Amino acid sequence: MLNRGTFQVFRGISGPPKKSVDLPKYDLVIVGGGIVGCATARQLLIEKPQLKVALIEKEKELAVHQSGHNSGVIHAGIYYTPGSLKAKLCVEGLDLSYEFFDKEKVPYKKTGKLIVAVEPEEVPRLDALFSRAQTNGCRDIEMIDSSKITELEPHCRGLKALWSPHTGIVDWGYVTKRFGEDFEKRGGKIYTSYPLEKISDNHDPGYPIRVSSGPALAEFETKNLITCAGLQSDRVAALSGCSTDPKIVPFRGEYLLLKPEKRHLVKTNIYPVPDPRFPFLGVHFTPRMNGDIWLGPNAVLAYKREGYSYFSISPSDLLESLSYSGMQKLVKKHFTFGIKELYRGVWIAAQVKQLQRFIPELKLSDVTRGPAGVRAQAMDSAGNLVDDFVFDSGTGKLSPLLMHVRNAPSPAATSSLAIAKMITSEAINRFKL
């Protein structure tokens, strides 16, 4: 059973239904047109094709936020705590993803991935990571020496590295839209431009939940509700009476771009050995499906939940983040780290210096500023970044009819089909579908 402890180029697919005496009725409504929401909607109709299911999304199209603003990496499951949902679902999701891509002819590349130790003190941590990858069931992971590193990536230096041949790249935003397309082909209904405003008791035993949108003046009646709201997940869960803890704190990651004439420097994903003292993986090299090479990212507090630049500011969002006791404790704990991340965002030479540890011939003149993404990271009141996927139902009369995805950061895209299977299994049992 899921529980809280263990656990948003179809534009305007359908306009929202207007209020009427006869409201649209569904067996299940899913909130959120990101990759987890679309994968779950699709899986529900694969396993229960008789269901009447709708998916609602507040933006004009699918995959506008995290699902369309990410590195595009297909992860192998190396980093995650053995026995965690992240570890289990990422390893399972990797195979399910490649199976879907091959069957549906979704373009992808198996670029592989190097996790490189460049200093002697990093080698023991790399050895521990290798052991973790084996425990997690990651396939064909190798520990390689400096000569093999050079063979795989001629411009990269390192003492030792983990080589993950099944790590790849794909356009996860495109994948999300393919999931949505398949969901519609199976009889599902997608409503875009539908910002969720209210979840309420419908006072109807047949369709006990009423889902309302404010600006669109639209409503649904549904038997059950699943929310996969990403950057808004804590706020959406609170609409049904759930605790706001863990809170979503948005972190913006800013990338650099390698100039086209320098793309020959990078062939595969190149990552550092993660430092367990800090909450993020560090800067890395990421090939993209269009041929670009992304370098980075840093990790700084976003001034808006869905703000992708320094000039995108929501005073209310920023105040909410800064006034949260957990955020204050995190800042106190990692103040120096945070200042360095801000510095690297402003002065790209500092970011290039970190990248030169792996590719010494990289120069400041070889890079330009690139895109940014915002990561929905759940944080508890003690200032800890929640390390695993989190699911919740809350309390109250409607709680047996609800499921909320509260925390689904990376590797949620890779894990999406496995997450969808797990949520679907739980929904069938809990909701008696």
UniProtKB/Swiss-Prot annotation:
GO cellular component, one term: mitochondrion
UniProt-listed Pfam families: DAO
Alphabetically ordered keywords of this record: FAD, Flavoprotein, Mitochondrion, Oxidoreductase, Transit peptide
Keyword Signal: no
Protein location: Mitochondrion
Matches recorded under Gene3D superfamilies: D-Amino Acid Oxidase, subunit A, domain 2, FAD/NAD(P)-binding domain
Catalytic activity: (S)-2-hydroxyglutarate + A = 2-oxoglutarate + AH2
Cofactor: FAD
E.C. number(s) listed in UniProt: 1.1.99.2
Class of enzymatic activity (EC top level): oxidoreductase
Domain of life of the organism encoding this protein: Eukaryota
GO-annotated molecular function: 2-hydroxyglutarate dehydrogenase activity
InterPro entries hit by this protein: FAD-dep_OxRdtase, FAD/NAD-bd_sf
UniProt record similarity statement: Belongs to the L2HGDH family.
Protein name (record): L-2-hydroxyglutarate dehydrogenase, mitochondrial
